[in-house]
Amino acid sequence: MAIFEINNSFLICAVSIALNPLLWNIAARSEYNHKTLTKLANGDSKKACYMLAACIFVAGIVRDLIYQNALKQQPTLGIFMNPLVQGIAKLIFCFGSVLVLSSMYKLGLVGTYLGDYFGFLLPERVSGFPFNVNDNPMYNGSTLCFLSTALRYGKVAGLLLTLEVFFVYRIALKFEEPFTAKIYAARDSKQAKKSE
């Protein structure tokens, strides 16, 4: 018996995992370079940011539901169903959730959902928990939640999809981190010129 199957629900899930960060990065770059979303929101950049936040949030929930549905259609590996693995899965989920929720709290709604691409820049780099223990707590916490769900359901396919989540987020960071640094460097340069 196979330990996982590449079926339609698995493939749909793999596509949804890849599309989430791709689409929000395309939308955010378009906003930064052309004010596309602000134009759609009648010139209100805060409203545009909230609209993107809602889209990202809903897309994340849809992706998570697709993931759970895909796992339900996969074979279960019995070794994952023992109490030790299930306990570890619960701990991983709790830690991942703490990373995600505490980073959302620290960043606020606008900071969490790409507000810097809309011109809403934080006064300084966020420090303190969870950013003092992890550079990317949202992405790493989310990845841990995927991992815990795979273990909880006892699905090897979930582990493979979790690996995809990990690599998709790493690729997204290759684009996001330098671009965000560029946005803040431009702001700092502008402020330095004003103070001269």
UniProtKB/Swiss-Prot annotation:
Residues exposed to the Lumenal side: 1, 29-40, 111-153
Catalytic activity entry: a 1,2-diacyl-sn-glycero-3-phospho-N-methylethanolamine + S-adenosyl-L-methionine = a 1,2-diacyl-sn-glycero-3-phospho-N,N-dimethylethanolamine + S-adenosyl-L-homocysteine + H(+); a 1,2-diacyl-sn-glycero-3-phospho-N,N-dimethylethanolamine + S-adenosyl-L-methionine = a 1,2-diacyl-sn-glycero-3-phosphocholine + S-adenosyl-L-homocysteine + H(+)
Single Gene Ontology BP annotation: methylation
Molecular function as annotated in GO: phosphatidyl-N-methylethanolamine N-methyltransferase activity
Start-end of intramembrane regions: 2-28
Record-listed E.C. numbers: 2.1.1.71
Record topology, Cytoplasmic segments: 63-89, 175-196
Pfam families per the UniProt record, alphabetical: PEMT
Pathway it works in: Phospholipid metabolism; phosphatidylcholine biosynthesis
PROSITE patterns: SAM_PEMT_PEM2
Top-rank lineage group of the source organism: Eukaryota
One Gene Ontology cellular component annotation held by this UniProt entry: mitochondrial outer membrane
Keywords recorded for this protein, A-Z: Endoplasmic reticulum, Lipid biosynthesis, Lipid metabolism, Membrane, Methyltransferase, Mitochondrion, Phospholipid biosynthesis, Phospholipid metabolism, S-adenosyl-L-methionine, Transferase, Transmembrane, Transmembrane helix
Positions annotated to bind S-adenosyl-L-methionine: 94-96, 176-177
Keyword ATP-binding: no
Residue spans crossing the bilayer: 41-62, 90-110, 154-174
Membrane-related topology note: Multi-pass membrane protein
InterPro entries: PEMT/MFAP (IPR024960), Phopholipid_MeTrfase (IPR007318)
Protein's job: Catalyzes the second two steps of the methylation pathway of phosphatidylcholine biosynthesis, the SAM-dependent methylation of phosphatidylmonomethylethanolamine (PMME) to phosphatidyldimethylethanolamine (PDME) and of PDME to phosphatidylcholine (PC).
Protein name (database record): Phosphatidyl-N-methylethanolamine N-methyltransferase
Taxonomic source organism: Schizosaccharomyces pombe (strain 972 / ATCC 24843)
